[in-house]
Amino acid sequence: MPRTLDPELRRALAARIRYYNEMGIYDFYRRPVSEDAGEVAVPIAADEDEIAVSHHTSPGEEMSPRKAAVAAPIVEENIFEVIALKPEQSVSDPVKALKIIREDLGDCTRCVLHKQGRKQIVFGVGNPKAELMFVGEGPGADEDTQGEPFVGRAGQLLNNMIKAMGIEREQVYIANIVKCRPPGNRQPERDECATCSPFLMRQIAVVKPKVIVALGATAAKTLLAMNSSMMQLRGRFYDFKPAGVHSNDPNWDGCKLAVTYHPAFLLRDPRQKGEAWKDLQMVMKELGMKAPKATT
């Protein structure tokens, strides 16, 4: 039986969330539940056929069960819809909308990465109306220095992959799961991804791509909320909607998402480049693109 909040408590929570929204706070994070926390006992109603009231009967008279009253459904306000309302949703220009998200991100101190040596926040770059979006895991040293995703050796390989598709880097949008460089170029921790990814979801809702390519396991697992291997994740499309936000465009209700290897991995194991090209060809077919003819 699903639990429902007391209507008065629900209205109070909705009012509190609106209050935070008016202060410019739009993202909320769940506290981990203590293992010692006890379960709240929820009374379970008996089946109506079992509900009967004892009453005096004359000899030979049978007792008949009294039908249980059926409560009218309660129409409750969905407080989580309040959380989903973002300031950029009232702006039709995607450039301005992305700027609002960047300003909301600010000089972010929401997770430990801000005090572990980052130089700057690496937000995202590219065409704000792109049909194709690439999402990596996080900035490296070169990205941290230049403030733009995928500008180092892995970025050069990504540029070549994009050119092989017959388009230029400027035609796509590129971002990462986390926007601060993890120390030593380590993989982002799960809590860091959970803290930063709401801003990425908002970027996706503004750009409204037709296809997202998740580069590497961290990006794929975070976006899809799946803990599967790359072998299991690759080779197919997933229906994707950015969690926690809604697009202000009624004609956009999510996109396709494909998974391929991260360019940094391909630098370490060039034998997998052919597999990555298969993934990109699948994306090209979905977008109606044709590979450019080889020149001699």
Residue ranges and their predicted role:
Residues E35-G38:
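Terminal amphipathic helices with adjacent charged low-complexity linkers/tails
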Residues M1-A12:
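Charged, compositionally biased N-terminal leader segments and the immediate start
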Residues R11, Y19, Y26-R31, A41-T296:
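A polyanion-binding, active-site-adjacent surface
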